[in-house]
Amino acid sequence: MKLGDWKFCLLLFQLMFLTNVCLSDLSFNPYKWPVNQLRRVIGAVKVTNTSNYFGFSLYENLNSNGNVFISPYSLASVMAMLYLGARGVTKNEMDLTLGYNSVNLNSEDLVLGFQQSLLLLNAESKEYQLETANSLMIQNTFNILDNYKRMLEDKFGANVQDVDFINKAELVQRYINAWVAFKTKNKIPILLNEPLKPETRLAFFNAVYFKGVWETKFDSALTRRATFYNNGYVPTQVPMMMLRGIFPFAYVSSLRSYVLELPYKGHEVSMLLLLPKDRNGISDLERDLSSSSLDSVTSNLREIGVLVTIPKFKLEETYEDDLKQSLESMGMTSLFSEANANLEGITGHRDLFVTKITHRTLIEVNEEGTEASGISSVVAGVRSGWKRPTFTADHPFVFFIRHNRSGIILFMGRVSQL
């Protein structure tokens, strides 16, 4: 086959450790905002809603019986960059799958919304470390439309690099792995175990890193080995952390689950944990849980003294073939079809389709926080006469990392086996 006859390959990668995003402080009068500022904020709210919707849909379709850990925001970010180049049937399918049509999110407001969230996402904070980055690598003999390139650079802050996938594949592989390692503080040191195929013409990357510390840290002296029931049935011994304190908490009868919020320092970001009352109740919880029901649940949490027992855990997940299959089952089929993909908005021609999409995540939760470093002393003794509610996560549970002001779900996952 001649090179000119090939449908060129486009690859998408999302790399993350953890992330946080914050939107504008909406306390001032919106009627006095410039129109463009108002559109950015409205766009950012719609980006939040669609990102959360997409995350829940993908979580449901991954249909894994083991651990799950995904970043809805990271996936939504890279899919948005791709969507802006989609046309025809491919665009319509992405509209439905990503939820854009349900909130009337057009391309211009999508760009403004992501621009707004990215500006604040990368704002400096003394309470946590955060980095996020977008990158697009282009075969140096390949042409993309100038307006598309400028949009990614100006609105998404993407670093656009010319590379040689054809003649210097191994060098490009090393460059990509070095970029990934740098952006994730070496938490994900290698993405590519082998060079990309020579027919690759574009590769999108999104990398995010978050390092947070609990507002109230667990006392490591209280951590002990205890039983966790893998998949709700199989007992195993794991390190369990203990903490007594006042936290937002509730029992939700409609979900037959306990809900607990553990804030990170600064209270801008929290971990939400949903624990089924029944040891094998995770499937029922996931069936009844949605983005809207989560919002309803968290709005009804009340601060109360709780004895918390949760496992230390580390999850490292990679999604590739199963991610592609899930997106196709959700309705995004033409994007991966050599015959039917339409990404004319990227090149001006129908010469691209997606051959590979990779989503890699890593999270570590310990006494200090989420991949926190350093040692601190915390007074968190447990009284023998404690009569307050308990939250004992000794069987499968669902968790979310959420930005509290915006409501955006940064990460979501299931701890099923340790």
UniProtKB/Swiss-Prot annotation:
Gene Ontology biological-process annotations: negative regulation of serine-type endopeptidase activity
Subcellular location: Secreted
Keyword annotations: Glycoprotein, Protease inhibitor, Secreted, Serine protease inhibitor, Signal
GO molecular function: serine-type endopeptidase inhibitor activity
Swiss-Prot/TrEMBL site (Reactive bond) positions: 383-384
PTM: N-glycosylated.
Pfam families: Serpin (PF00079)
Superkingdom field: Eukaryota
Glycosylation sites noted in the Swiss-Prot or TrEMBL record: 49, 404
Signal peptide segment: 1-24
Family per similarity comment: Belongs to the serpin family.
PANTHER family found in the cross-reference section: GH10112P-RELATED, SERINE PROTEASE INHIBITOR, SERPIN
Described purpose of this protein according to its UniProt entry: Serine protease inhibitor that specifically inhibits clotting factor C. Does not inhibit clotting factor B or proclotting enzyme.
Subunit note: Monomer. Forms a covalent heterodimer with clotting factor C. Interacts with big defensin.
Record protein name field: Intracellular coagulation inhibitor 1
